[in-house]
Structures are given as C-alpha cells and as structure tokens.
Amino acid sequence: MINRKNTYKSKSNNETDDKKAKSALQHCSRNNGVRTPGPAVLTALRKPAAFALLICIGATAILGCSGGESLAPVKPERAAEQTDSPVPNPTQVLSGDYIPPVQTPLPLPADEPNPFETELQFNNENFARAFKYKYGSICVSDRSSIAELHLRRCGLMYIDDLTKFGYLRVLDLSENMIYDLSPIEKLTALRKLNLDTNNISDISHLSELTELLELDIDKNNISNLYPLTPLKNMTKLLAHENEIHDLQPLSELTKLQKLGLRSNSISDLRPLSKLVELRELYLHDNSISDISPLSELHELRRLNLHDNVLSDISELRSLENMERLWIYNNSISDISALAGMKELSVLYAGMNSIEDISSLAELVNLTDVSLHNNAITDVSALEEHVNLKKLDLSGNPLDDSAVEVLCTLTGLEKLDLQRTGISQEGIAAIRAALPKANVLA
C-alpha cells in the first residue's frame, strides 16, 4: 500500500528545495548574468550533496558580485553597462572591498638592542679610552662616516684593530709610544699617515698601503726604508731623525715632491737623482760631501743642506727655480753657482769661508739673507737691494766702507752688524738712514 502521506511530504520537500535552488540561482542571475535553470537541472539539484555544492557556488558568486571576478560570462548588454559606469576614485574605499594589511617590520624584542645602535667597542682598553676622550661615544652605525682619526699625544703603546673603519683616509698617531704597526696594514684606503715621534723600528706593515700619498715617520728608530718601495703614489715623505743611511729604496718613488731626511746618517745621494719632481728636499745634519746627484732636480724650490761637510756647491748652478736655500755651517768658500737663481728669496750661508758675494748682485728678489761668520769685507753686491727685509752680516770683518751701501737698503726691518769692524759713527749713520730697521751692533 502506498504511503500517500510520505509521498506528499517528499513532494512538498522537493518543491521547497526547488524554490531554494531557484532563488539562489536567480540571485546569481541578477548579479552575474547566470541563466535560470530548467526543471531538469532543478531535479538534479534535489540531492543533498548537489544542493550543498550549489550553495558554495552561490556564495562564491555573491562574493564575486561584491568585487571579485564573475563566475559566468557577462552578457554583452551587461558588459556595456559596466563599461559605461563611472570609475570609482582609487582612494575611495568601497563597502565590501578587500583591504590588504599594512606590512610593517617586526619590532626587536625589548631585551635585544639594535646592533647598529650599540656603542663601538675596542679590544684595547687604553685605545678605547683615548678614542672616547677625543670623539666621545660612537655607534656601530656611525663608523662608516669616520674618514679621519686624530689620536696625537694620547699615551698609546698599542693600536687597536682599526679595520672596522673601512673608510679611513687620514690617521694621526703622532707623539705616542707605538712600536707595532701590524693593525695598520689592512687600512689600504689610507691617504695620509702620521707616525711622528714613536718607538717604531719596523715599517714592513706599511708596504700594503699603496694608496698612501703622505707619510710622516719622523723621530723613530727606522733604518730600513725598503718596505716603502711599493708606495709609488707617495708625494710627501718625512723621515727626519732616524737611523737611515741607504736611500736606494726611494729611487722608485718618482712622484715624490717633498722629502725630509734631516738628522740621519746619509752620505750617498745617488738614489735621489731620479726624483725629478722634487720641489722640497731637506738633507741637513747628515754627512754629505757630494751633491752632484742633485743637479738634475730642476723643479727644486727649497733645498736645505746645512750642517754637512760640503765644500763645493757648483752642481747647484742648474737649479734656476730655487727659492730658498740653506747651506750654512759647511766649508763653502765659493757661491758663484748661485748667480743664476733669479727666484731666490731666502739664503742662509753663514758659518762658511765665503769672501766674495758678487754673485748676489743680480738676485733682486732676496728678502732674507744670512751671511754671518764668514770672511766678507765687501758688500757692494747688495747695493739697492730694496726688497731685503732681513740681513745678517754679524761676525764678518767689515769696516766703515760698508756704511754707504747699507744705507741704500731702505726696505730693511732687521740688520745685524754685531762683531764687525764698523765704528759707532757708522752705526749711527745707518740708523739715521734706516729709521724703520732694528739695527743690532
């Protein structure tokens, strides 16, 4: 017997399901252009699994209506409507739009400080103290901005690892007690290095600093200059007061313009003959007797040879660009080689055996001349040298015949005539003629 009640109930449920499915698809039809299904489709969708799938598709379609992509093709007339609709303001947030979260970096934990904001640390306590005294506290992030370090007279015996300062161009460690230069060898970007007045004897760690332009190693215990041979870009080298005697390592440093070798044990100047760009050369207080290798250094402007064992300076004749020359305290008697130095302004030639100064007659640019303690009796070569500011003739056997010439030097500011044979009357006449000059007698 057929249960009509159950059949009716089943039919009623099917009709209800048909209405729900049809309603869902009509909603999608209004929003996405999906066609309303026929009875066959509705019959297939009466099964629970199919109906659940339909609900998922409907939900996706509804989300697509709100801002996503449509699940079904859009009718031509609907596409036209969408094309004609005004484009919303891109800054305007529409209801239902998906807004991505703002990507922000995660903060560091409170117990983990930013490594770039921590204070720069040094291994050597004494170095750290000197650095902090000069520069205060420096963060790790600031080290790349440090191009110069000036740690002069800080009582340093050791240098800390300075490789952390990769951009360092200038380093001044003068007047300390440093003897080990190994921490410097990796500072290959250095342009200027001052190691004046330390306890250095070994400079082998400097051989890698090929970009170095200026080096000061004055007042140390250095005897071997061979580690400097690779430093071919150097233009300035100061090595006063060391134990240097061999200059051969310098022969290849042809870009040198200033070279200081005062107070060493130098006697042979031949390696310097190739340094044709030299403009300043300081060789005083050595054991030099032969200066012929200097004859090719035509660019020389300043040359200091005082306190050596020179007797012949004829090789200086070709150095016509000379501006300042120091040759005092030697055994020189002839200065005729100076006649062609038209640019000479400073001449210190005291404590020699000079009698004749006629070679100075044409050197009208002279401003400062010292000829003390020689054997000069005639100063007529200096007549009307109005550019002279300072003149030292002390310790020469002059007499009153020099008074007339000296009265013509109206530009003088200081005149030393002590220990000469000029009378008091002659001194008085000179003072009257040169009221602006300080005349010592």
Protein language model regions, located:
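Ankyrin-repeat and related helical/solenoid repeat scaffolds used for protein-protein interactions
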Residues: 365-422
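N-terminal capping/linker segments that flank leucine-rich repeat
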Residues: 65-166, 170, 183, 227, ...
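Thr-biased low-complexity repeat/linker tracts and other Thr-enriched repetitive architectures
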Residues: 257, 265-267, 274-276, 287-289, ...
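Gram-positive cell-envelope targeting signals
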Residues: 1-83
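Leucine-rich repeat
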Residues: 143, 164-168, 184-190, 206-212, ...
